[in-house]
C-alpha cells in the first residue's frame, strides 16, 4: 500500500528526490553526531523516583552547563545547590546528568558494585578528545581497564614513588640553585613550577640516566601543542563532533603531528634502553605491547596521559600550594619553622641519601608539611565537577532510584568545602572555606574518605597521586627553606583552562 503511494510520487518528483536524499542523510548524520557529541545520549530519559512513589524526576537545571562546569564551576555549584538542593539533574549538552553533593551520596554510589561503573566514552568532552587519548588507560572500562590498570599500578605504587624520591630531590635541589632572582619577582606561580613535575616524571618513565637534555627539551617542546589540543577538546563545540576528524583541519593535523613526534621520541628511548641494558618504565611497559597484553596505542596514549595530561594537573596543585602560602602568611611561617628545624638537623648529622633527615621528613605523614599539602588538595580540586560516570545497574542514592546508564557527576566544590567534617560545630561558620592545615591533626584520610575527591574516589583514583604528593611536599620544603612567598596580585581563577588554575602573580624574597 505504501509502495503504491511512494513509487508514483518518486517518479513524478525524481529530481527533487535525487537532491533531497543525500541532504536527508547528512541531516540525520549530524543529528546523530549532535546527540552523541556530549557523551552518553540520555535526552531526558533519566528517571529518578523515591521508594514507593510513582515515577518522577528530580529538580532539574535546564541551562546547558557543558562549558560552564569547566569555566565557572564554582558559581554553578553554588547556584544549583541553592535552587535544586542536595541531589538534582543538570543539562550537559544533549544529556542530563545526576549531580552528587554530599559525602553520604558519594558513599552510597561507590559502595555499589564498582565493577559496574564506567567512564563515558568521551569523558563528557567529545570525539576530538577520543582522537587524542581514546585508547589510554583512563578511557578504558570493564575488563580492559582492570587488565591495564593492574599493569600500570605496579609502577605507580607508594613504594615506587619513594624509591624514585632521591632522583626527584636531586633535580628539585638543582632547580632551586639555578633560580634566577630576576625571574622570581611578580611571576605566574604556574609558570614557575610547571617544569618540575614534567621533568621528574619524564626521568622516572624514560630513565634518569638516559634522559639527555636534548631528549627532555624535545618532549617539552610538545607541551604547548598538547595543552592547546586538550583545551580545544573540552572548551569548544567543534571539538565534540566526530565528523571533524575526517576533515584535514588544523587541529587534526596537530593531533597527527603531536602523536607522530611523541611516538618517534618514545620508541627511540625504548631502543636506547635495550641497547644500554638499563631497564626503564617505558621499556618494561612496551614489553606488554609485544606480548599482546595491550595495544601499541594503549601504551603510547597512556604514557601521553601520564606525562602530558596528568602533569598539568600536578603543576596546577603545586601552583595553588604557593598561592596558599602567599595568602596565609601565619601558616607559611609555621611551616617554614618546621622545615628549617629539619634542615638544621640535616646540616649537623652524618648521613647518606637514604638517611637524610630532609628526605625522611618529606616521607612522613604526620607533619605540618603533609597537612598543608592535604589542605591544598582539599581546597583546590582540579575540576569543580568530576568527569561523568555511568553504572550498568540500578542505584539507590538518598532513597532515590537512579536508572542504569544515567551519567553521574560529583560536585567537588560542595564535597570538598561543605562536608560536615570540614565544618565542625565548635568552629566558625564556613570554616570549610578557610585554609586551615591544622584541621588534619584530628582527621585521618580514612575519616575524610568521601569528603575530599581531588584525586577521585573509588577504584579509579588518580594513578599518579603518590608521586604528586611527594612532588608538592618537595616543592614547598625547598622553596620555603630559602624564600618568603608573597602575593603581588589578587587571586582569581583562570577562565580559559579546563582545570581550575590560579590567575595571579607571586614574589619570592630570599630569607
Swiss-Prot record:
<dbReference type="InterPro" id="IPR002401">
    <property type="entry name" value="Cyt_P450_E_grp-I"/>
</dbReference>
<protein>
    <recommendedName>
        <fullName>Cytochrome P450 monooxygenase PUL2</fullName>
        <ecNumber>1.-.-.-</ecNumber>
    </recommendedName>
</protein>
<dbReference type="InterPro" id="IPR050121">
    <property type="entry name" value="Cytochrome_P450_monoxygenase"/>
</dbReference>
<comment type="similarity">
    <text>Belongs to the cytochrome P450 family.</text>
</comment>
<dbReference type="GO" id="GO:0016705">
    <property type="term" value="F:oxidoreductase activity, acting on paired donors, with incorporation or reduction of molecular oxygen"/>
</dbReference>
<feature type="glycosylation site" description="N-linked (GlcNAc...) asparagine">
    <location>
        <position position="141"/>
    </location>
</feature>
<keyword id="KW-0812">Transmembrane</keyword>
<dbReference type="GO" id="GO:0044550">
    <property type="term" value="P:secondary metabolite biosynthetic process"/>
</dbReference>
<keyword id="KW-0479">Metal-binding</keyword>
<comment type="pathway">
    <text>Siderophore biosynthesis.</text>
</comment>
<dbReference type="GO" id="GO:0016020">
    <property type="term" value="C:membrane"/>
</dbReference>
<feature type="glycosylation site" description="N-linked (GlcNAc...) asparagine">
    <location>
        <position position="116"/>
    </location>
</feature>
<dbReference type="GO" id="GO:0020037">
    <property type="term" value="F:heme binding"/>
</dbReference>
<keyword id="KW-0408">Iron</keyword>
<feature type="binding site" description="axial binding residue">
    <location>
        <position position="462"/>
    </location>
    <ligand>
        <name>heme</name>
    </ligand>
</feature>
<dbReference type="InterPro" id="IPR036396">
    <property type="entry name" value="Cyt_P450_sf"/>
</dbReference>
<keyword id="KW-0560">Oxidoreductase</keyword>
<dbReference type="Pfam" id="PF00067">
    <property type="entry name" value="p450"/>
</dbReference>
<keyword id="KW-1133">Transmembrane helix</keyword>
<dbReference type="GO" id="GO:0005506">
    <property type="term" value="F:iron ion binding"/>
</dbReference>
<keyword id="KW-0503">Monooxygenase</keyword>
<feature type="transmembrane region" description="Helical">
    <location>
        <begin position="14"/>
        <end position="34"/>
    </location>
</feature>
<comment type="function">
    <text>Cytochrome P450 monooxygenase; part of the PUL gene cluster that mediates the formation of pulcherrimin, a red iron-containing pigment composed of two cyclized and modified leucine molecules that acts as a siderophore, a chelator that binds iron outside the cell for subsequent uptake. Two leucine molecules are cyclized via a cyclodipeptide synthase, and the resulting diketopiperazine is oxidized by a cytochrome P450 monooxygenase to generate pulcherriminic acid (PA), which can then spontaneously bind iron to form pulcherrimin.</text>
</comment>
<dbReference type="InterPro" id="IPR001128">
    <property type="entry name" value="Cyt_P450"/>
</dbReference>
<dbReference type="InterPro" id="IPR017972">
    <property type="entry name" value="Cyt_P450_CS"/>
</dbReference>
<keyword id="KW-0325">Glycoprotein</keyword>
<keyword id="KW-0349">Heme</keyword>
<dbReference type="GO" id="GO:0004497">
    <property type="term" value="F:monooxygenase activity"/>
</dbReference>
<feature type="glycosylation site" description="N-linked (GlcNAc...) asparagine">
    <location>
        <position position="442"/>
    </location>
</feature>
<keyword id="KW-0472">Membrane</keyword>
Amino acid at each position: 500500500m505504501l509502495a503504491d503511494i511512494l513509487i508514483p510520487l518518486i517518479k513524478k518528483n525524481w529530481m527533487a528526490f535525487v537532491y533531497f536524499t543525500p541532504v536527508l542523510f547528512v541531516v540525520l548524520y549530524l543529528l546523530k553526531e549532535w546527540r552523541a557529541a556530549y557523551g552518553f545520549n540520555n535526552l531526558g530519559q533519566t528517571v529518578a523516583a523515591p521508594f514507593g512513589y510513582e515515577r518522577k524526576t528530580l529538580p532539574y537545571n535546564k541551562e546547558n552547563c557543558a562549558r560552564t562546569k569547566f569555566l565557572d564551576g564554582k558559581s554553578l555549584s553554588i547556584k544549583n545547590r541553592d535552587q535544586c538542593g542536595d541531589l538534582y539533574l543538570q543539562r550537559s549538552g544533549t544529556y542530563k546528568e545526576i549531580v552528587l553533593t554530599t559525602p553520604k551520596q558519594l558513599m552510597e554510589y561507590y559502595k555499589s558494585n564498582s565493577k559496574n561503573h564506567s567512564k563515558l566514552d568521551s569523558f563528557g568532552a567529545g570525539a576530538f578528545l577520543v582522537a587524542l587519548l581514546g585508547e589510554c588507560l583512563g578511557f578504558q572500562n570493564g575488563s580492559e581497564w582492570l587488565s591495564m590498570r593492574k599493569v600500570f599500578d605496579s609502577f605507580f605504587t607508594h613504594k615506587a614513588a619513594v624509591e624514585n624520591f632521591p632522583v626527584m630531590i636531586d633535580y628539585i635541589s638543582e632547580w632551586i640553585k639555578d633560580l634566577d632572582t630576576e625571574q622570581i619577582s611578580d611571576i605566574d606561580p604556574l609558570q614557575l613550577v610547571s617544569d618540575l613535575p614534567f621533568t621528574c616524571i619524564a626521568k622516572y618513565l624514560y630513565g634518569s640516566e638516559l634522559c639527555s637534555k636534548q631528549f627532555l627539551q624535545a618532549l617539552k617542546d610538545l607541551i604547548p601543542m598538547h595543552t592547546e589540543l586538550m583545551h580545544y577538546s573540552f572548551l569548544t563545540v567543534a571539538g565534540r563532533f566526530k565528523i571533524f576528524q575526517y576533515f584535514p583541519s588544523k587541529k587534526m593535523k596537530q593531533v597527527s603531528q603531536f602523536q607522530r613526534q611523541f611516538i618517534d621520541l618514545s620508541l627511540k628511548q625504548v631502543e636506547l634502553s635495550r641497547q644500554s641494558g638499563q631497564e626503564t618504565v617505558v621499556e618494561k611497559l612496551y614489553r606488554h605491547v609485544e606480548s599482546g597484553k595491550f595495544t601499541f596505542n594503549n601504551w603510547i596514549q597512556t604514557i601521553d596521559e601520564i606525562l602530558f595530561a596528568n602533569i598539568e594537573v600536578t603543576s596546577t596543585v603545586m601552583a595553588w600550594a604557593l598561592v596558599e602560602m602567599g595568602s596565609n602568611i601565619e601558616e607559611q611561617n609555621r611551616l617554614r619553622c618546621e622545615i628549617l628545624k629539619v634542615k638544621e638537623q640535616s646540616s649537623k648529622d652524618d648521613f647518606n641519601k637514604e638517611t637524610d633527615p630532609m628526605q625522611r621528613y618529606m616521607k612522613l605523614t604526620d607533619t605540618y608539611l603533609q597537612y598543608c599539602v592535604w589542605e591544598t588538595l582539599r581546597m583546590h580540586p582540579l575540576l569543580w565537577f568530576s568527569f561523568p560516570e555511568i553504572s550498568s545497574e540500578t542505584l539507590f542514592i538518598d532513597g532515590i532510584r537512579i536508572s542504569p546508564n544515567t551519567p553521574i557527576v560529583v560536585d567537588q566544590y560542595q564535597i570538598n568545602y561543605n562536608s560536615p567534617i570540614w565544618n565542625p560545630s565548635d568552629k566558625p561558620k564556613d570554616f570549610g572555606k578557610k585554609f586551615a592545615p591544622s584541621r588534619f591533626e584530628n582527621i585521618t584520610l580514612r575519616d575524610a574518605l568521601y569528603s575530599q575527591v581531588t584525586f577521585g574516589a573509588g577504584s579509579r583514583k588518580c594513578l599518579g597521586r603518590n608521586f604528586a604528593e611527594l612532588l608538592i611536599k618537595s616543592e614547598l620544603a625547598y622553596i620555603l627553606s630559602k624564600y618568603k612567598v608573597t602575593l603581588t596580585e589578587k587571586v582569581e581563577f583562570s577562565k580559559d583552562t579546563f582545570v581550575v588554575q590560579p590567575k595571579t602573580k607571586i614574589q619570592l624574597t630570599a630569607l
